[in-house]
């Protein structure tokens, strides 16, 4: 079988690599020439444990080839971004563009699957688009939706071991899609209709957002009452039916920080809890900014000179290089606006460089700093000493 994967980003590339290593012939398509060139050279543009070796194997065996345009295949998969606009409305234009790019290549019996996160009803909408452009293919294609279920940092394991939800426009489509995924997914495959599969993805991430909001709200309460939030959570979690998450400086990533808006935009009257969770998590980022600014001001008043501040972490979660929707980026951007000549040192051990911020080795920035701000609990940070001669702002539980 030959499959064409449209989009070689944080989901498309790992999926293509895993499928290729299971013997499926994969043509990976991306409009970014640099990604295509890098992939064909066997070098991953994504930091992910184990991915580089598997990519090298896939390219060497010629099971994975990257191109800038799609080609004819037995199956087509859509892995493109679905961002939200400034009005917090989902933008499916990339999904539509990717779909239009494969419409001329479709043949009877082909499988078409969307993995991108989409509003409820999008798969049916794309099916209508395909059939408008190619009416002769009506009822001759297998069309399905299968949301990705993996987390950066553990992508390879979750790609193969997590259960998957597969929604078809009919039972035959769901079955055909499940047949394909069974070649590289060892988890159980659950078939349903497209709308249920679409909303399932949105519900999963909205639920996580609500959970995180609870933890973040607790951290603010504890700060105002002189209670250590990590101690509180550890004790509360001793209850067999309680599992409070670790608070952070907000919520990032292209899923949890974004997907709730897909439900909110479609069901504004029915999503009051989800909307409030979004407000809490957004506010937590601003709360952290206020705390950092206050610490800088307090230091200046006490010591009569400006502090050196180490900002530790830019990624949206520990031990990855993914900066999408990262609250740490927003925090650093605000702190960098301070016009008092405070020296700000930024460290992100998973990046070699950043297009805006000058990055400094985390050991050096920690050593020089008067104030250390932990925004991301990267594993290397946990080896740094919990000293008393510096102001430590641990927003993510590095020292928990």
Language-model segments: residues:
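Structural/interface elements that position substrates and couple domains in central-metabolism enzymes
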Residues: 1-400
């Amino acid at each position: 079988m030959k499959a064409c994967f449209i989009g070689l980003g944080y989901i498309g590339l790992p999926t293509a690599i895993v499928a290729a290593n299971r013997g499926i012939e994969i043509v990976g398509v991306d409009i970014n020439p640099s990604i295509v060139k890098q992939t064909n050279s066997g070098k991953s543009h994504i930091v992910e444990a184990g991915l580089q070796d598997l990519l090298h194997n896939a390219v060497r065996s010629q099971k994975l080839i990257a191109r800038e345009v799609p080609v004819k295949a037995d199956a087509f998969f859509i892995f493109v971004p679905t961002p939200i606009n400034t009005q917090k409305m989902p933008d499916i234009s990339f999904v539509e563009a990717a779909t239009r790019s494969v419409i001329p290549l479709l043949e009877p019996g082909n499988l078409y699957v969307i993995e991108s996160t989409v509003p409820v009803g999008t798969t049916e909408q794309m099916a209508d688009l395909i059939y408008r452009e190619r009416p002769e293919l009506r009822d001759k294609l297998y069309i399905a939706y299968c949301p990705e279920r993996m987390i950066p940092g553990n992508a390879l394991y979750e790609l193969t071991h997590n259960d998957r939800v597969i929604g078809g426009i009919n039972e035959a489509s769901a079955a055909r899609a499940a047949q394909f995924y069974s070649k590289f997914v060892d988890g159980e495959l659950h078939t349903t209709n497209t709308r249920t599969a679409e909303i399932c993805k949105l519900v999963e991430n909205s639920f996580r957002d609500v959970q995180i909001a609870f933890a973040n709200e607790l951290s603010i309460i504890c700060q105002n009452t002189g209670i250590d939030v990590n101690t509180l959570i550890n004790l509360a979690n001793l209850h067999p039916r309680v599992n409070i998450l670790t608070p952070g400086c907000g919520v990032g990533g292209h899923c949890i920080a974004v997907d709730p808006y897909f439900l909110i935009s479609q069901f504004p009257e029915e999503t009051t809890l989800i909307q409030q969770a979004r407000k809490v998590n957004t506010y937590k980022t601003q709360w952290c900014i206020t705390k950092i600014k206050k610490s800088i001001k307090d230091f200046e008043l006490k010591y009569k000179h400006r502090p050196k501040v180490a900002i530790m972490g830019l990624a949206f979660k520990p031990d990855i290089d993914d900066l999408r929707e990262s609250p740490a980026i927003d925090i650093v951007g605000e702190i960098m606006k301070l016009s008092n000549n405070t020296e700000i040192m930024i460290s992100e051990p998973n990046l070699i460089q950043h297009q805006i911020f000058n990055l400094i080795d985390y050991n050096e920035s920690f050593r020089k700093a008067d104030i250390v701000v932990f925004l991301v609990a990267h594993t290397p940070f946990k080896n740094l000493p919990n000293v008393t001669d510096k102001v430590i702002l641990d927003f993510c539980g590095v020292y928990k």
